[in-house]
Amino acid sequence: MPANPGDLVRSLRQRLGLTQEEFAHEIAVTVSTVNRWENGHAAPSKLAWKVIRDLARRRGLTAHLQRPQQSVNGR
C-alpha cells in the first residue's frame, strides 16, 4: 500500500485507468487539485476521501481505502 496520501491517490487513479483530468471530473475537483494531492503539496479532505472511496467502489475496486493520517510537508 502506498505510504502517503499523494501516492495513494495516484495509485488508485492509475488502477482505475483514469487520467488526472478524468479523475478530477469524476470526483468534482480541479485537475490542479489532483496534481497537488499527487505531488504532496496538499491532501484530500475527509469529504474528498469519501468521494474517492465511493468512486473506487462504483468501479469495482474493493481494496481497503483508509484515509492516511500522515501530514503533508511535515505539517
Q: What is the predicted function of each stretch?
A:
Residues 9, 28-30, 52-54:
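Secretory-pathway ectodomains
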Residues 65, 69-75:
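Helix-turn-helix/homeodomain-like alpha-helical modules used for DNA recognition
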Residues 1-4:
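A detector for short, charged/polar N-terminal pre-domain segments
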Residues 39:
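Short, conserved catalytic or interaction motifs in soluble domains
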Residues 45-66:
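DNA major-groove recognition helix of helix-turn-helix/homeodomain DNA-binding modules
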Residues 17-36:
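Short alpha-helical DNA-recognition segment
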Residues 9-22, 59:
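Short basic helix-loop element that most often maps to the first helix and adjoining turn
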